[in-house]
């Protein structure tokens, strides 16, 4: 089975748990470490990129209570034109899906779409890859060092760092009837 199909199967298998988590998380305000106050993305040499995000609070290196109470928590750098994003996520309640830091922050590329129902902002269509990259967390800053070839693929190869339009903190919630997968993405500010 391909990685893409196994991730889709995993998403379907936890839908009931996600729906319960959505009810719990919907009443919670997002923590300051998910409020992105500044970000950057640029090339580092001919084949590597560096993405960074600064938030309004210290980013925990391990799961805190908010992370444990939500199925997926993350910071995303997104190309809004194609709906693709590189996300740094942490999701101990969902389980392991990465060989790099499976119990802590790790990377995925994802495809997003519109159609989510409030209070969600986007639909999570698919998790496309789990690239390996350097993740540094220092206080309120997260920096990602990655091969440019590992950026999200919008159908014609990886996007460039110049295609990235936004960086945001987010949580993922199940039970969104507006999303084909049932998975809604809520931007946290």
Label every PLM stretch briefly.
Residues 12-22:
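Bacterial N-terminal signal peptides
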Residues 114-141, 145-146:
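Short helix-loop boundary/capping segments
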């Amino acid at each position: 089975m391909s990685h893409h199909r196994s991730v889709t199967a995993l998403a379907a298998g936890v839908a009931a748990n996600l729906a319960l988590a959505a009810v719990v998380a919907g009443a919670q305000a997002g923590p300051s470490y998910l409020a992105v106050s500044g970000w950057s993305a640029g090339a580092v040499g001919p084949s590597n990129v560096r993405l960074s995000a600064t938030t309004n609070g210290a980013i925990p290196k391990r799961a805190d209570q908010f992370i444990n109470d939500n199925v997926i928590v993350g910071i995303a750098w997104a190309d809004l034109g194609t709906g693709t994003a590189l996300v740094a996520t942490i999701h101990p309640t969902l389980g392991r899906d990465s060989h790099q830091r499976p119990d802590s922050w790790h990377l995925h590329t994802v495809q997003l779409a519109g159609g989510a129902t409030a209070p969600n902002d986007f639909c999570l269509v698919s998790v496309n890859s789990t690239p390996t990259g350097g993740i540094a967390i220092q206080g309120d800053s997260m920096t990602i060092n990655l091969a440019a070839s590992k950026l999200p693929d919008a159908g014609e190869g990886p996007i460039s760092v110049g295609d990235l339009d936004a960086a945001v903190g987010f949580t993922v919630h199940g039970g969104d009837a507006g999303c084909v997968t049932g998975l809604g993405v809520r931007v946290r500010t």
